[in-house]
Design a protein with these regions (language model features):
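Metal-dependent phosphoester/phosphodiester hydrolase catalytic core
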Residues: 1-133
Length: 133
């Protein structure tokens, strides 16, 4: 390995298997297994991980327009929560895990690596879609 990072950060789009997240997640892990073994990593989901080309979470509402332009999620809550759980299970617990609409879980935390404190924040879940409110 040419690079020897102290920390890995994956900010989304780890997975493009829009209807079979677990398959894509295992595939992602297999690609990076050698570097995951001995260093901390931060991994958070983004639009493609939850089956969207773009996602404006609109605080968890159900998307109804083509392309989800009204905001929200087109896949079931169970799927959205599964994706987040699979990708963030290894990070410290969220200090205030109050879910958004439809009981979609939220995720934010902090992690300290090498004396540096990192805030891990998600934002896509709270954005409004381009069709507006």
């Amino acid at each position: 390995m040419e690079q020897d990072p102290d920390l890995l950060f994956f900010g989304g789009d780890q997975n493009y298997h829009h209807t079979e997240h677990t398959v894509g997640w295992i595939e992602f892990g297999m690609h990076f297994r050698d570097i995951f073994r001995d260093r901390p990593n931060i991994c958070i989901p983004d639009d493609h991980d939850v089956g969207h080309g773009n996602v404006w979470g609109e605080s968890g509402k159900n998307a109804t327009l083509p392309g989800s332009a009204d905001g929200g999620y087109k896949f079931p809550v169970k799927y959205v929560n599964q994706v987040q759980r699979q990708q963030s299970w290894h990070l410290p617990d969220c200090p205030h895990p109050t879910p958004v609409n439809r009981d979609i879980s939220v995720y934010f935390t902090r992690i300290t690596v090498g004396g540096v404190d990192f805030a891990v924040l998600e934002d896509r879940k709270f954005k409004s879609g381009p069709a507006g409110k």
